[in-house]
Every structure is written in structure tokens, then in C-alpha cells.
């Protein structure tokens, strides 16, 4: 059994987390942990990867084992799926704690996570697709759609002011799977939907949710909110991507003002 040296503990660690915790819940909700182990039972990686035990992670946070938490593997091996919170009787937002630690305590993100966030900040989308390539892909898929359904009036509208729905794409659909673009447009056409997409900011994905970068997350959400206002649409529709839906639905309440985020989001 490992020895815990009390002199090495930093009791203020929980307060440091609470001060920067982007959440709609009690910022100290993790202090409600009962150590019951339901989170560990829910975690898909518990006992599969070393250190992947949410219950132990929370205990380390509460005890103030700051260095062990920051240098451990848990914060980066966690997928932030939220299964632990779903089963937690106290609703402790473990994924939110992981996200907060990733982005606010000087730990370096592994692999290309930060690169993806930087791409989205610098180019408008996380795969650095140029506006020219994006618009050409939409035009190409519009032509394919017209040919397939034998209707020259079928459209993939761009920057249509006053449409009911503003649709956000996954950059992978644009870059690697353009047939998905055609399929979505076909559904919209068959439904008779009054919809559009933006020529400027159209990326549904939001990797600031995973990196813990609140500043980046705010910028990305504001860009989408500006498109909603600019195009005067009623609803925002997000392509099939779980984290993108969460980022738009939950994120706009956290990172935007009530006025900026006053629009419904559908998936």
C-alpha cells in the first residue's frame, strides 16, 4: 500500500479547481463524493488502463494530492464520456474536473490535441480546410444532388438570411466524406426544410471541450453565435457528433452571455 505523506498534500487544490471550473453546477460538487465506487463501475476503462479509477482520482483531488494528479495518466486517458457522472448518485461532474485540470494547471496536452484547437482558431475549422475548398465541395455536392434526384432546383444554400435552420458540418464530411454532405442535403430537400449553412464559420466540432481551453472555447462559441445572429436563423442544427452537440447546448450557457446564447440547438 502506498504511503501518503501529509506534508506533500495541498488542501487548497480543490479550491483552485473550483475557481476556474466552467460548470452550471456547484463549483465544489466534487466534495459531495461518497466514495461509493459507482463511477469506477461505470468507467469503460476502469481496471483496463493503469490508474483509470475515477473514485481514486476524486479522492486524490479531495486530499490535495496535486502533483500526483497533474503528473498522472488519468487526466489524459479519460475520454470525458461522462458515464461516471451518469451513475454517480451525487452527480459529480468528473469529466468537468478532468477538463478543468487539463486547461488550467499548466499541463501540456499530448499528441495533436492542441494543434487541432489551434487549427480551428486560426483557420475557422479543425482540419484547416480553406474557404475555397469548402465552397467548391458544397457546389460539387449540390450538382451531384441535382443529378441524383433529377431536380435542378435542389440546393445546398449558403449564407441565406432568414432561414429556419443554420446547419453546422463536421470538417471530415467536407474533406473526406463529401457524400455525407449530399445525403444531409437530400434529407433537407425531401423535408422541404428552409435551411442554410455559413460560408465563414461552419465547423460543428469543438476540441476546446477536450483541451480544457476556456478562452478558445469562448471564441469558438462566439463565432457560431455571431453567424446565428448575422443570418437571422431560428435554430442551430448540429451534424452527428456527440461532443459537438454538448459543446453547443451546454457550452453556450457556460461561455456565452444569455443574450448571445439565446437560440435553440438541435442534433
Predicted regions and their residues:
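Short, intrinsically disordered, charge-balanced linker/junction segments flanking boundaries
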Residues: 261-267
Amino acid at each position: 500500500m502506498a504511503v501518503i505523506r501529509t506534508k506533500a498534500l495541498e488542501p487548497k487544490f480543490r479550491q483552485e479547481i473550483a475557481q476556474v471550473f466552467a460548470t452550471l453546477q456547484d463549483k465544489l460538487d466534487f466534495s459531495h463524493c461518497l466514495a461509493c465506487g459507482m463511477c469506477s463501475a461505470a468507467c469503460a476503462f476502469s481496471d483496463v488502463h493503469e490508474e483509470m479509477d475515477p473514485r481514486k482520482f476524486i479522492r486524490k483531488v479531495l486530499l490535495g494530492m496535486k502533483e500526483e494528479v497533474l503528473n498522472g495518466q488519468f487526466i489524459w486517458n479519460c475520454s470525458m464520456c461522462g458515464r461516471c457522472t451518469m451513475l454517480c448518485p451525487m452527480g459529480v461532474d468528473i469529466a468537468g474536473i478532468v477538463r478543468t485540470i487539463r486547461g488550467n494547471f499548466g499541463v501540456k496536452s499530448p499528441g495533436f490535441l492542441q494543434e487541432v484547437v489551434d487549427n480551428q482558431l486560426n483557420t475557422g475549422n479543425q482540419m484547416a480546410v480553406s474557404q475555397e475548398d469548402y465552397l467548391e465541395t458544397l457546389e460539387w455536392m449540390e450538382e451531384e444532388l441535382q443529378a441524383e434526384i433529377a431536380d435542378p432546383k435542389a440546393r445546398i444554400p449558403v449564407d441565406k438570411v432568414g432561414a429556419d435552420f443554420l446547419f453546422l458540418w463536421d470538417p471530415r464530411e467536407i474533406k473526406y466524406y463529401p457524400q455525407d454532405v449530399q445525403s444531409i442535403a437530400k434529407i433537407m430537400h425531401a423535408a422541404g426544410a428552409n435551411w442554410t449553412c455559413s460560408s465563414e464559420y461552419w465547423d460543428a466540432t469543438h476540441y476546446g471541450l477536450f483541451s480544457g481551453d476556456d478562452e478558445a472555447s469562448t471564441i469558438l462559441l462566439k463565432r457560431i453565435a455571431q453567424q446565428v445572429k448575422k443570418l437571422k436563423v431560428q435554430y442551430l442544427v448540429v451534424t452527428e457528433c456527440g461532443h459537438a452537440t454538448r459543446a453547443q447546448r451546454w457550452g453556450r450557457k457556460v461561455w456565452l452571455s444569455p443574450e448571445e446564447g439565446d437560440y435553440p440547438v438541435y442534433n
